[in-house]
Regions:
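Compact, glycine/acidic-enriched structural inserts
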Residues: 134-172
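Short, flexible coil/linker segments at or flanking structured domains
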Residues: 98-101, 145, 181, 189, ...
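Generic alpha-helical structural element
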Residues: 7, 21-24, 143-146, 150, ...
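An amphipathic alpha-helical core segment
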Residues: 162-209
């Protein structure tokens, strides 16, 4: 985990690498920019192979707190942008599951920026049909299959993360608050992050994710979610 010297000026590499990966016409939501600044100001990142990965909680403390029935840190998510040579391969595998040329429309409208689950699910920025940038979820298929618009604004994405689910890829948890009676594993809230979201954006944290997200899945026969409809079309 990185340590920032007092007064040091450090380039926001996490944000710079995301901007470099954006398709033309896509913008980083201002709230996501603020999040990346908060991550780097707190030193919640590491660097591997020239690529920066950001977190909501210091990973050494999270690992130390992890036991069979509880951990600290709130939602576990990793923010990253893969190196250029791997981006098309990642999307090609997700859409087609085979070595096939990636459709230009996919590259022009989608940019993965986070890993939402340890089983391979991802969050991405997506340009909708009106040219608006939304945050979407791409289920891995081997674990989570949730594929839908996750947040229609950067602020709602931060509010979703602040609720404090273990991982946001598991929509079966979304109908109840974290650490409900049926939960065998306790995830203690990330109070520092929650406080930052509330105070910075003068907002509230929902009780459940269903206040923000209407989950749909890769195998839904008649989807209504605009992102999933698009996925089905471009994956043909």
């Amino acid at each position: 985990m990185a340590n920032l010297a007092k007064g040091a000026i450090v380039e926001n590499l996490l944000l710079a690498q995301l901007r470099e990966a954006l398709p033309q016409g896509m913008c980083v939501p201002s709230e996501l920019e603020a999040l990346y600044a908060w991550i780097e100001a707190n030193g919640f990142y590491d660097d591997v192979g020239g690529r920066r990965r950001g977190y909501l909680y210091p990973q050494d403390r999270l690992r130390q707190s992890w036991s069979d029935d509880e951990r600290e840190g709130g939602t576990d998510i990793v923010f990253f942008t893969d190196e250029p040579k791997n981006r098309d391969e990642e999307l090609r595998y997700w859409f087609y599951g085979e070595d096939r040329e990636l459709a230009a429309e996919i590259k022009q409208r989608l940019c993965v920026f986070a890993g939402s689950g340890s089983e391979g699910s991802m969050c991405a920025l997506w340009l909708d049909d009106a040219g608006e940038t939304k945050i979407v979820h791409m289920g891995s298929g081997s674990g989570s299959t949730m594929t839908c618009v996750l947040a229609r604004s950067g602020l709602d994405f931060l509010r979703l993360l602040a609720i404090g689910y273990d991982e946001i890829c598991w929509d079966e948890d979304f109908s109840a608050p974290p650490n409900s009676e049926d939960d065998d594993f306790i995830v203690h809230p990330n109070l520092k992050f929650q406080q930052w979201v509330i105070e910075t954006f003068k907002t509230t944290i929902p009780q459940t994710a269903l206040e923000l997200v209407t989950p749909e899945h890769l195998d839904d026969e008649n989807p209504s979610d605009e992102f999933l409809i698009w996925v089905n079309r471009v994956a043909e």
